[in-house]
Amino acid sequence: MIKKASLLTACSVTAFSAWAQDTSPDTLVVTANRFEQPRSTVLAPTTVVTRQDIDRWQSTSVNDVLRRLPGVDITQNGGSGQLSSIFIRGTNASHVLVLIDGVRLNLAGVSGSADLSQFPIALVQRVEYIRGPRSAVYGSDAIGGVVNIITTRDEPGTEISAGWGSNSYQNYDVSTQQQLGDKTRVTLLGDYAHTHGYDVVAYGNTGTQAQTDNDGFLSKTLYGALEHNFTDAWSGFVRGYGYDNRTNYDAYYSPGSPLLDTRKLYSQSWDAGLRYNGELIKSQLITSYSHSKDYNYDPHYGRYDSSATLDEMKQYTVQWANNVIVGHGSIGAGVDWQKQTTTPGTGYVEDGYDQRNTGIYLTGLQQVGDFTFEGAARSDDNSQFGRHGTWQTSAGWEFIEGYRFIASYGTSYKAPNLGQLYGFYGNPNLDPEKSKQWEGAFEGLTAGVNWRISGYRNDVSDLIDYDDHTLKYYNEGKARIKGVEATANFDTGPLTHTVSYDYVDARNAITDTPLLRRAKQQVKYQLDWQLYDFDWGITYQYLGTRYDKDYSSYPYQTVKMGGVSLWDLAVAYPVTSHLTVRGKIANLFDKDYETVYGYQTAGREYTLSGSYTF
């Protein structure tokens, strides 16, 4: 880890705090430029969520964590474990880069977008979330933003927890971190979660057969990590985790064919790294291997039957990153190498698939008087579509003490996914989708209120679409996204308030029609307080109107889905210094709504849990 004092001295800027549960402006983040830096020096809007926040919200899924954050719009085909999509600032679900400990999530390689309904919440110790383009640092996918899920635990100790809730939900978790001598620590975790679920209905998406069954979810997780400090400057780590999930869902049925309504996902990841943390120079070398097997099958025949489908991908990654303190800032440079291989049949591709990508990048951060400058440039060499370059730049001006104006511009891209390139309807000549983004923002501290308001525009070209006549994918689509985002956090006596507002106008630039499944407006409000040792929390979310497709008849019709206001209530009580009990009511007023047309949401749900630490 970087020594905090040296970087704070090099980047000594006025403290501005973005929307986050951890409101300290000097909170260190690693996602912006791959090395730790104070959040106040990151000019892009940044949110940090800690494990303490997740426990206070009593979230049982990663999607429940992310839905609370500015700019995020989550859609899901029902309840726990069902297919979900993340839209950030109106961009496509495939325009979000999801990292696990700084390494690209493997599952995103098969489908082209990350489905975090499958990722275990037990592994999440911290989330760093950056909005806006970041391809100049990370390469493909980082058009709407970057979500970095960090699994490293900060504090030693052991925790045993259990929870129960509606729809026969149950969860059991054991985790421990122990110091072995002065220089070595080990972390272990095991988690089991299961819910019977409910019938998501899937109106218009099941073919000729109604499927009036519960659509449940089961997840089993193991995690282990070993960290060692060789000297004050040199350290290394090895970690691995895996999860085994089963999801029941409502599938499309064709008469005379098996009903593939069960999903079985196996995923494992292994990382190893070596870090050098000097006073002026920082360097890290990280290697990673991940392997996922994703079955969809009819449980009457089993996942090895010829009717079943299998998406299998292996991902190999090597990252070498370096950072040098220069003046009142730093310069960074590095190389990424990634190889993805698939087995025949993955993504409906008959043959096996192998794709390599090598990226080199340069980043810079510097303070000059009242100005802060940030920039990055990157070149990717891909075995499929050749070389592609991206860049971004930002400038911040503290025009009055405690108030800052920020202007930024960046380019980014999304590489075509496996099915689009080599599937039955694939086109190997596809180009990457490209984005140009502008943003202007004011932020400051006024009468105890940390606030930020920004306006942005994102023009996306060469969008990949499907042609009903040629039965092929092609580059032609264009999107124009305009938006306003406002965030604030403040205290009034014992009450802590966190609020955000998003207005997103995301349209097809050719037809001027709204992009599907994006809420035009969102309001999010979190209120926390303590009363007689009880920790209370109220969460409010307003989801505005959105459009979707009704697939129950042909030709498909566009439908308008009305807005909804949702409330959650959570409370926790420390029975002793070691034992805490928690309870939560989600969707307090039992609102009936959908985020994907035809797929029901859960309605009111209750959970009760307890944790014992020692």
From Swiss-Prot:
Residues 38-152 form the TBDR plug domain. Ca(2+) 2 binds at residues 213, 215, 249-250, 261. It comes from the Bacteria. Keywords: Calcium, Cell outer membrane, Ion transport, Membrane, Metal-binding, Porin, Receptor, Signal, TonB box, Transmembrane, Transmembrane beta strand, Transport. Residues 21-157, 179-183, 228-231, 278, 326-327, 370, 401-402, 444-448, 491-493, 530-534, 573-584 are periplasmic. Residues 155-614 form the TBDR beta-barrel domain. Calcium increases vitamin B12 binding affinity by a factor of 50-100. (Microbial infection) Colicins E1, E3 and K inhibit cyanocobalamin (CN-B12) uptake; E1 and E3 inhibit binding of CN-B12 to cells while colicin K inhibits a later, energy-dependent step of CN-B12. One of its GO terms (cellular component) is transmembrane transporter complex. One of its GO terms (biological process) is cobalamin transport. PROSITE patterns: TONB_DEPENDENT_REC_1, TONB_DEPENDENT_REC_2, TONB_DEPENDENT_REC_3. A motif (TonB box) lies at residues 26-33. Disruption phenotype: No longer takes up colicins E1 and E3; colicin K uptake does not change. The chain crosses the membrane at residues 158-165, 169-178, 184-195, 217-227, 232-248, 263-277, 279-296, 309-325, 328-337, 353-369, 371-381, 385-400, 403-417, 434-443, 449-458, 473-490, 494-509, 517-529, 535-550, 558-572, 585-596, 602-614. Induction: Constitutively expressed. Primary control of btuB expression by cobalamin occurs at the level of translation initiation. It is a multi-pass membrane protein. Cyanocob(III)alamin binds at residues 83, 85, 92, 110-111, 251, 309, 517, 551. It is found in: Cell outer membrane. Residues 166-168, 196-216, 249-262, 297-308, 338-352, 382-384, 418-433, 459-472, 510-516, 551-557, 597-601 are extracellular. PANTHER family: COLICIN I RECEPTOR-RELATED, TONB-DEPENDENT OUTER MEMBRANE RECEPTOR. Belongs to the TonB-dependent receptor family. BtuB (TC 1.B.14.3.1) subfamily. Involved in the active translocation of vitamin B12 (cyanocobalamin) across the outer membrane to the periplasmic space. It derives its energy for transport by interacting with the trans-periplasmic membrane protein TonB. (Microbial infection) Acts as a receptor for bacteriophages BF23 and C1, and for A and E colicins. Cyanocobalamin (CN-B12) in solid medium protects against colicins E1 and E3. Does not act as the translocon for colicin E3 (ColE3). The translocon is OmpF; trimeric complexes with ColE3, BtuB and OmpF can be cross-linked and immunoprecipitated. Interacts with TonB. (Microbial infection) The hairpin motif of the receptor-binding domain of colicin E3 (ColE3) interacts with BtuB without displacing BtuB's central plug. An N-terminal fragment of E3 binds OmpF; trimeric complexes with ColE3, BtuB and OmpF can be cross-linked and immunoprecipitated. This is Vitamin B12 transporter BtuB. The gene is btuB.
